[in-house]
Amino acid sequence: MTAVAEQTGAWLAEFTRQETTEPWIQALRDAAFERFSKLGFPTTRDEEWRFTNVAPIARASWKTAQVSGRPIPQEALQHLGKHAPENAFSALNTAFLDRIHFVEVPRGQVREEPIEIVYDATGADGQHLAPRTLIVVGPHAHCSMVETYRGTGKYFTNAVTEIVAGDGAVIDHYKIQHESPEAYHVGTLQATLGRSTNFSSHSISLGGALVRNDAGATLSEGTEATLNGLYIADDSQHIDNHTTLDHAKPHGTSHELYKGILDGRAGAVFNGRIIVRKDAQKTDSKQTNKNLVLSNEAVINTKPELQILADDVRCTHGATIGQLDAESMFYLQSRGIPKREARSLLTYAFAQDIIDRIKIQPLRESLERMLFEKFRSVKP
């Protein structure tokens, strides 16, 4: 028996246990499971996964849990599954489509209050969850959305979010991941953006034993996209962020800032790709990845990438890896601040500009409290 067959056998048993559903949904499920069966789980021999070993997910036997949401409406058919990448984890999520959070914001509507979705895996020990979110924002509509992932015990969340934005829309998307320290989390976010759309994504990764975030956006003419990310890993956590900004049309602008804080024996990966297509002249794109490493055993692998096929563009990228500044530590301690507290203050200061970019005040304040508490436990 091949490795792929061994991995997919247990999933086939779970797949066939699902209740029958609408024919069009079943067709999506069947096609997705066939794709997953052919692909199998990625391995470290795959370039996109060379620093992240998903064997603990692939080898485990998971029972399927029902996730929050509502039955899939017919009107979701136009976009569901049309935007997420066709990789193994996205296929696996689609194969277990059951309920969905489907959000439609009509043309010109301005939603003043954020739309909040909580995927709570409390009590899901030993289970697999496949949350699915589809957000369709009409032309010139405005909305903010917050997705929160949390839970207790050892479980596997495999989430997919697709965002479709009409011309001139404004979307702020927030993903707050503070899963159980024993949990596995694979999340895919893919946004397809219309002309002159303004899109921002804020990814905060705090929990999970093994985490992979894939965030991508395809830009049209005059689109502005911003990707902000903060990942904090300690003990033996592993957090992998892969991002793709695809400038498909001219006059697009993108800004990306991802920051990581690593302690203990933690590992992290950042792979950020900016693609500028041949027709995407006058593109302006900047990508930055900064990492703060607090221990000798923590490891970060960072790889910013530019793929430029146009000639009239302005694109920059860079990555840094550093430690706490010794002079700043000395300055704080010379003013009577204990070493542990000084370390905590400087660590928070490193993360603060990401937190400050969060426009929803209650969410920003909640994260500030969460980070203060987390950094209080940073070892001196």
Tell what function each PLM region has.
Residues A31, H79-I337, A351-P380:
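Conserved beta-strand/loop scaffold segments within soluble protein domains that form the structured core
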Residues M1-H101, P106, I115-I117, L257, ...:
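N-terminal amphipathic, basic helical "cap/leader" segment at the start of enzyme domains
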